[in-house]
Amino acid sequence: MFLAKSIVCLALLAVANAQFNTNYASGRSGMVHLFEWKWDDIAAECENFLGPYGYAGVQVSPVNENAVKDSRPWWERYQPISYKLVTRSGNEEQFASMVRRCNNVGVRIYVDVVFNHMAANGGTYGTGGSTASPSSKSYPGVPFSSLDFNPTCAISNYNDANQVRNCELVGLRDLNQGNSYVQEKIVEFLNHLIDLGVAGFRVDAAKHMWPADLGVIYGSLKNLNTDHGFESGAKAYIVQEVIDMGGEAISKSEYTGLGAITEFRHSDSIGKAFRGKNQLQYLVNWGVSWGFAASDRSLVFVDNHDNQRGHGAGGADVLTYKVPKQYKMASAFMLAHPFGTPRVMSSFSFTDTDQGPPTTDGQNIASPSFNSDNSCSGGWVCEHRWKQIYNMVGFRNAVGSDAIQNWWDNGSNQIAFSRGSKGFVAFNNDNYDLNSSVQTGLPAGTYCDVISGSKSGSSCTGKTVTVGSDGRANISIGSSEDDGVLAIHVNAKL
């Protein structure tokens, strides 16, 4: 009997453990959130940029039909009308083609899935032509009726876990995930995406759903589609949106047994450090001692689509593309450090926090335009195409799983460390120059700094660093330089 129970427990553990595997193709790391991009444009980006530059995956905006709202704000994508795959980003055929094309070049697709709720009042018409009556909780495109929802009540007290999970988030009709029919429709939706070749999901508003109900849903998912290059038996990577800054009734620890979580404390803490509110020397023990979830349970980011707008967690300390020098430094630190699964934000520029993506006519999303230096125009920021960020994805791929060694700091805001003997990075966030002889851990030779430039044949378009036979190098980062970071690795040796 004990043996039988042990086997069952081990089987359940195996299922759970698989949800933390990113399913990345070998030798790749780093996910990018191509926020509000169209499917055809993402497919081309996988082939032309993400694949060649070593990115491992793309988080895409919600794929299912959403309510059409006046002035087309970004958040209409988070107001589901049905689970039909028709949005401003494209239809099911375009989505399926994108997933295939991205998988073919080693770039995985992760879908932002919204199944905590359906559209709020006023969301009567969808992007796929479906109609709904949110006031009577009728969504015939699924179909859902009032029987499938929790009673109407508003969330006003985040110290009441029952209210947070059973009431409505800003008027969004709250589905009852404990209802077997609701579970069935959600699983049907997710399994359809798995059939189409996705590698995993970001689960929106996970803290507003009961962990036990999510466990039933996740446990009902198919294995990933081997026709798309996934290993037999591979399970979807699940990252749950759980904002836990402490002091609330709901804790991320309730969810980390089911999958990874969005580690908002990482965003808050890295913002404080690179904004100068916390000295960089204290990053020496970056990780769980900062209150983060375990490394394989943490999706980490500098900013996300919510908190760059002041929504969610982090407030004024969150770094965004609007503070480019510090943003690039924080992104470089995240990508250089082994902690967590990093996600790079790729934004559109905005002045109004409700503003939707660039359009051609006020309705249809515009494609990004690309400049000769790889940057974007046409209202798209494309942080993932900034040299200081995409070259650090290359750094992360070059250093692999090598541990942090050779930590150095000046007792203030100048720090450096190596990743084993494969990579070295240094930062200067002080208001005076960094000029020091530092142990890099790297083999002797001349290296190209991948922040200021790129290796091109046997030359470098930026700074070079000469490492001596003892592994030391003279590191120089002026306080007035455009970039407060320098990075070298074995694949950038000249």
Swiss-Prot record:
Q: Does the keyword Zinc apply?
A: no
Among InterPro entries, the record links this protein to: A-amylase/branching_C (IPR006048), A-amylase_C (IPR031319), Alpha_amylase (IPR006046), Glyco_hydro_13_cat_dom (IPR006047), Glyco_hydro_b (IPR013780), Glycoside_hydrolase_SF (IPR017853)
- What EC number is given for this enzyme? 3.2.1.1
- Disulfide cross-links: C46-C102, C153-C167, C376-C382, C448-C460
Feature: compositional bias, Low complexity: 351-363
One GO biological-process annotation of the entry reads: carbohydrate metabolic process
Q: Which reaction does it catalyse?
A: Endohydrolysis of (1->4)-alpha-D-glucosidic linkages in polysaccharides containing three or more (1->4)-alpha-linked D-glucose units
According to the record's subunit comment, the protein's assembly and interactions are:
Monomer.
Looking up PANTHER family in the UniProt record yields: ALPHA-AMYLASE
Name of the protein described by the UniProt record: Alpha-amylase 1
Name the lineage: Eukaryota, Metazoa, Ecdysozoa, Arthropoda, Hexapoda
